[in-house]
């Protein structure tokens, strides 16, 4: 900390700030006592004429004293502002107990929890079911997931720039309402697409083939279900518009209304709620997938069947209604919480050193009020190399998070031979402690060790390097379950990669339709495409567990005894020995990826000026979404499609993928993960070396600030600190 010797006393060197504050709440509500209001005459006598502006004023002034600069901070309280909690004139005193940072944090966490549960939980959980129900490819479902970020990018500049200088809680409340509308739109295809009907392959039957059967069924099945992806994209676009204020205006509103040392904790709690939302979405969504999509209708399908489609739409109806309920209290919060402006100078003291012309522009009280200042605001951020590098680092992390969160359940489903609901639930069990715990722990560590600027970036470097090393877990993979005609021949020989041969001597005389995909596990440990391709009779028994059992299947070699083989409907269980180790390292990747999220966000807030924080977060989210969240699901979906072995045949057109090659899927995940992790590490390294620490520390300044009550009630106060 720079010190200036003036006799036996050392003064803290600070820029001179003149700023105003709203009045604090009294015990009986948010009303300001008349005695605490400073008259204009008293202000003029104490400090001279300050003008009528009620906004924070930043007027750097230099005064030479014995060849040294002694600069002081003056605190000036403004006239009363409306800081009551309520709606228009309806501001009952019973509501003022919530008019605190903690009260606002509660409702903001509820909104972020709901957004995370909907966008990053339910959608990622049901994506496989939607592909199945509406005949979509993975890249098409990836485009649905990316539509959220596309809408956010289109709105971020407008929302962060004008919302940053406007009434933030109102922007947030209306955003949550739009989010709820998007959820209702997303559930709409279930009610307009008609009933989900599946033709089951029950076995050989009579064994007769109808020559015109395929043509008739193809003609009748041309329903254009894949066009419903446009409705899903519209719902996601509304989700993106509604969620845009949450992670820009919501974060800066918290940062503006709490002490700077507590800001990482508040933001970490907020982001932890946003992480726990997807976790709850995975768990609740997984449970909903165990309910048949046509609720109340009986079906012979089981949850283990690849043709099973769960009730994917129920969660979106619930979140749509909940969003309307959460938006109401958020709309009632004031522009500023009582006593918040006492933290302005503390935030300014922690800000990275800016160039003279940048500091002069943002110190103007009128800066950022009109659209004419928008080009200059963007230019000032583009000239900040630390900010740009942190944006690029965030984009690389967002690519992985978006891609893996969208297709993580599908990866588990393929590797461990699980049903869609089992895979979603397992992935949720990893996300709950790893994502939520990592986010909360990151903010706690920044506060615990008083990390500032360069120290925060060093911490991000450590987290990125650790998760990069853990990503080598994808060198491992679980072998594919042997599937006759797909991964292995009917006589046990291996098939050339990419070559399918479902016909064999044991089923050649029967009329087996490849569109009837209904896998079953034979007693020989091999999985078969359908009962017909396994040579099973039409009649099937039902065991005590409710599963269908086929006996006398001609293509299954019984190993325990001579005679015909048996088979059970559903996939064969995976015997992967490396499953526990793979899950542990995936947990490490997730926790260290999220461990750096709050520190990186805090570093972004500390490397730009106070007036540009909302706008800077908006620009950062544009970069993160444009380069990360939008291409992430699309790229990962395209990569996963490359690993497909068996496609659904929709009358000569590819439907969704039935079977993936596990080794190729792991290899592609490894290449993608290492590429983006290395880039992120390099961006953090460059940001560390280009970051310029502030010339004044905020540690000494914090002790010199008045208490919250005095900051709000005392009309005039000079702050000097001995060190």
UniProtKB/Swiss-Prot annotation:
| Bias (Low complexity) | 33-46, 701-723
Q: What GO molecular-function term can you cite, just one?
A: prostaglandin transmembrane transporter activity
Which residue intervals make up region (Disordered)? Answer: 23-64, 700-723
Domain annotation Kazal-like: ranges: 500-557
Q: Cellular component per GO?
A: plasma membrane
Question: Which residues face the membrane's Extracellular side?
Answer: 124-142, 195-224, 296-309, 403-422, 474-582, 641-673
Sorted alphabetically, the keyword list is: Cell membrane, Disulfide bond, Glycoprotein, Ion transport, Membrane, Phosphoprotein, Transmembrane, Transmembrane helix, Transport
Q: Which domain of life is it from?
A: Eukaryota
Query: Where is the PTM Phosphoserine found along the chain?
Result: 39, 42, 45
Q: What residue ranges lie in the Cytoplasmic compartment?
A: 1-102, 164-169, 256-274, 335-380, 447-450, 606-614, 692-723
The principal localisation class reads membrane
Could you confirm whether the keyword Glycoprotein appears in this record? yes
- The positions flagged as glycosylation sites are 212, 566
Q: Which residues cross the membrane?
A: 103-123, 143-163, 170-194, 225-255, 275-295, 310-334, 381-402, 423-446, 451-473, 583-605, 615-640, 674-691
Where is this protein localized, as stated in its record?
Answer: Cell membrane
Gene Ontology biological-process entries: monoatomic ion transport; organic anion transport
Could you tell me what this protein does? Answer: Organic anion antiporter with apparent broad substrate specificity. Recognizes various substrates including thyroid hormones 3,3',5-triiodo-L-thyronine (T3), L-thyroxine (T4) and 3,3',5'-triiodo-L-thyronine (rT3), conjugated steroids such as estrone 3-sulfate and estradiol 17-beta glucuronide, bile acids such as taurocholate and prostanoids such as prostaglandin E2, likely operating in a tissue-specific manner. May be involved in uptake of metabolites from the circulation into organs such as kidney, liver or placenta.
Family from the record = Belongs to the organo anion transporter (TC 2.A.60) family.
Q: Show the domain comment.
A: A conserved histidine residue in the third TMD (His-190) may play an essential role in the pH sensitivity of SLCO4A1/OATP4A1-mediated substrate transport.
Q: What is this protein called?
A: Solute carrier organic anion transporter family member 4A1
Q: Which gene encodes it?
A: Slco4a1
């Amino acid at each position: 900390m720079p010190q200036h010797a003036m006799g036996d006393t050392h003064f803290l060197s600070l820029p001179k700030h003149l700023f105003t504050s709203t009045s604090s709440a009294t015990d009986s509500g948010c009303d300001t006592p008349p005695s605490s209001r400073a008259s204009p005459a008293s202000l003029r006598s104490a400090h001279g004429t300050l003008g009528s502006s009620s906004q924070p004023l930043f007027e750097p002034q230099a005064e030479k004293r014995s060849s040294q600069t002694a600069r002081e901070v003056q605190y000036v309280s403004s006239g009363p502002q409306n800081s009551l909690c309520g709606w228009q004139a309806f501001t009952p005193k019973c509501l003022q107990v919530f008019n605190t940072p903690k009260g606002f944090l509660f409702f903001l966490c509820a909104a972020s929890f709901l957004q995370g549960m909907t966008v990053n939980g339910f959608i990622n959980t049901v994506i496989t079911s939607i592909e199945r129900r509406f005949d979509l490819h993975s890249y098409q479902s990836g485009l649905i997931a990316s539509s959220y970020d596309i809408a956010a990018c289109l709105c971020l500049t407008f929302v962060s720039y004008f919302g940053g200088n406007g009434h933030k809680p109102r922007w947030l409340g209306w955003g949550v309402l739009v989010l709820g509308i998007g959820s209702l739109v997303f559930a709409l295809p279930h009610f307009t697409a008609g009933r989900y009907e599946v033709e089951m392959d029950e076995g050989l039957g009579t064994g007769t083939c109808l020559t015109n059967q395929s043509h008739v069924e193809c003609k009748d099945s041309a329903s254009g279900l894949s066009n419903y992806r446009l409705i899903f994209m519209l719902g996601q676009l509304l989700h993106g518009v509604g969620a845009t204020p949450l992670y820009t205006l919501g974060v800066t509103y918290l940062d503006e209304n709490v002490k700077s040392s507590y800001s990482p904790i508040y933001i970490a709690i907020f982001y932890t709620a946003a992480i726990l939302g997807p976790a709850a979405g995975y768990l609740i969504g997984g449970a909903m997938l165990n309910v048949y999509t046509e609720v109340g209708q009986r079906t012979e399908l089981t949850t283990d069947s690849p043709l099973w489609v769960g009730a994917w739409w129920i969660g979106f109806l619930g979140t749509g209604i909940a969003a309307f309920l959460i938006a109401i209290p958020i709309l009632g919060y004031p522009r500023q919480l009582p006593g918040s402006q006492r933290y302005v100078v503390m935030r300014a003291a922690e800000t990275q050193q800016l160039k003279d012309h940048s500091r002069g522009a943002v110190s103007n009280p009128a800066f950022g009020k009109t659209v004419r200042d928008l080009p200059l605001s963007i230019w000032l951020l583009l000239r900040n190399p630390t900010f740009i590098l942190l944006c690029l680092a965030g984009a690389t992390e967002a690519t992985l998070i978006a891609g893996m969160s969208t297709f993580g359940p599908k990866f588990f489903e393929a590797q461990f031979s699980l049903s869609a609901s089992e895979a979603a639930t397992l992935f949720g069990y990893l996300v709950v402690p790893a994502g939520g715990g990592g986010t909360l722990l990151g903010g706690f560590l920044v506060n615990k060790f008083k990390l500032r600027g360069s120290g925060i970036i060093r911490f991000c470097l450590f987290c990125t390097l650790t998760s990069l090393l853990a990503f080598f877990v994808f060198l491992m993979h679980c072998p594919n379950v042997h599937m006759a005609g797909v991964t292995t021949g009917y006589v046990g020989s291996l098939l050339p990669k990419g070559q399918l041969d479902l016909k064999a001597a044991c089923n050649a005389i029967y009329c087996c339709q490849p569109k009837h995909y209904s896998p079953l596990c034979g007693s020989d440990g091999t999985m078969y495409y359908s009962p017909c391709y396994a040579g099973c009779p039409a009649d099937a028994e039902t065991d005590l567990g409710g599963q269908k059992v086929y006996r006398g299947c001609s293509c299954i070699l019984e190993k325990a005894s001579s005679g015909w083989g048996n088979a059970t409907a559903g996939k064969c269980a995976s015997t992967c020995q490396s499953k526990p180790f793979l899950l542990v390292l995936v947990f490490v990747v997730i926790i260290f990826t999220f461990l750096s999220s709050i520190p990186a966000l805090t570093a972004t807030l500390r490397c730009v000026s106070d007036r540009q924080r909302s706008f800077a977060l908006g620009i950062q989210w544009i970069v993160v979404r444009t380069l990360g969240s939008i291409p992430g699901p699309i790229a990962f979906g395209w990569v996963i499609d490359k690993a497909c072995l068996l496609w659904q045949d929709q009358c000569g057109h590819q439907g969704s993928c039935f079977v993936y090659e596990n080794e190729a899927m792991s290899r592609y995940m490894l290449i993608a993960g290492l590429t983006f992790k290395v880039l992120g590490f390099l961006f953090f390294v460059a940001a560390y070396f280009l970051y310029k620490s502030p010339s004044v520390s905020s540690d000494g300044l914090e002790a010199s600030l008045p208490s919250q009550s005095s900051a709000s009630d005392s009309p005039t106060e000079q702050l000097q600190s001995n060190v």
